[in-house]
Amino acid sequence: MKLIREEIENVEVIVEERGGKKNLYIEGVFLQGDIKNRNGRMYPCGTLAKEVSRYNEAFITKGRALGELGHPDGPTVNLDRVSHKITSLRQEGSDFIGRAKILSTPMGNIAKSLLGEGVKLGVSSRGVGSVAMNNDCLLYTSPSPRDTAI
């Protein structure tokens, strides 16, 4: 088993206002299946769909789908670095579209400031799994343990 990370850079910034309070969200492709990514890996769409379903049930629906600012070295979320909470993750073809609320934490405030200044932030997913060589790419072969983060 090894740490597996994937980064996607095209996300949209959305500002929603409710009751005079503004909330900042990012939305876009969080995961992609059945294509070779720039890290030379391919994740079968069926495996991603199963893991996303499990992640939705275990984390998103319970308000526990937290993420960090930056690229952590391990598969678990460090609460002192939390910047966002994933509010939805759904499949559209071989893409998995996510939406995350930027939180009012120290790291969330840094993310808000960067986005406000026009910095383009991306989404990085990580987990622990196994990979095997398949033609010209590494094929993800086994699911992550329970504490995978997006």
For the regions a language model picked out, list residue spans one by one:
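Short, solvent-exposed loop/turn motifs
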Residues: 30, 42, 65, 75-76, ...
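N-terminal low-complexity segments that are often proline-rich with Ser/Thr-Pro
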Residues: 148-150
